[in-house]
Amino acid sequence: MTRQCNCSEGSCGSGRYEELVLERMLYSARLKETVARRDSDVIAAMATMIAETFRNGGKVLLCGNGGSAADAQHLAAELTIRYRSSVNRPALPAIALSTDTSALTAGANDLGFDEVFSRLTEAYGRPGDLLLGLSTSGNSPNVLKALQTARKLGLKTLALLGGDGGTIRPHADLAVVVPHTGSADRTQECHIAIGHVIVELVESMMGYA
């Protein structure tokens, strides 16, 4: 239903705001289409690596900052609980490293914020596990150090990034880089869409869907 503006001469600016809505949402859709057409094989390969990790008794660690921390927690919850209510399956072990405020603040205070995720990766990660790092810039120092630590410990590494992939990209076994710069929002929208597809694929690959 189209709602008409009742103000005189459209002085509320609703037309301008409607144009902004259209512009933002269409750009977001085009960005997702670009990533889907370019990286569908990489996204499927990421899901395969995660499914193999679970089949072999490993767990998935996830990390990111700000909105990316929220995305990491979001995806960890869908792996641990389930993605869709129509799927009945066992819990899958996934841990978002941004959820323990005591550990995060102790690490930031004692070691520095750049070290918080690497320290938790050292604590929880074991050979055969997998770390997924999220960074809209591709340059988050604490995510970078977590992936470096993960590799040293024998974990597989995945990354969802933005821009040109930044300093993190070379440290991921597989990475999807969203070609957007200047703000985190559109990149995060792509990351969560990719994450949802990955979780759906993992459930299917493991025979649950």
From Swiss-Prot:
Cofactor requirements of the protein: Zn(2+)
Keywords (A to Z) from UniProt: Carbohydrate metabolism, Cytoplasm, Isomerase, Metal-binding, Zinc
Pathway the protein takes part in: Carbohydrate biosynthesis; D-glycero-D-manno-heptose 7-phosphate biosynthesis; D-glycero-alpha-D-manno-heptose 7-phosphate and D-glycero-beta-D-manno-heptose 7-phosphate from sedoheptulose 7-phosphate: step 1/1
Gene for this chain: gmhA
Main subcellular localisation: cytoplasm
Stored InterPro entries: GmhA/DiaA (IPR035461), Phosphoheptose_Isoase (IPR004515), SIS_dom (IPR001347), SIS_dom_sf (IPR046348), SIS_GmhA/DiaA_subfam (IPR050099)
Binding-site list for Zn(2+): 74, 78, 188, 196
PROSITE patterns in the record: SIS
Name of the protein: Phosphoheptose isomerase
Record GO terms (molecular function): carbohydrate derivative binding; D-sedoheptulose 7-phosphate isomerase activity; zinc ion binding
Further facts: The reaction produces a racemic mixture of D-glycero-alpha-D-manno-heptose 7-phosphate and D-glycero-beta-D-manno-heptose 7-phosphate.
Lineage of the organism: Bacteria, Pseudomonadati, Chlorobiota, Chlorobiia, Chlorobiales
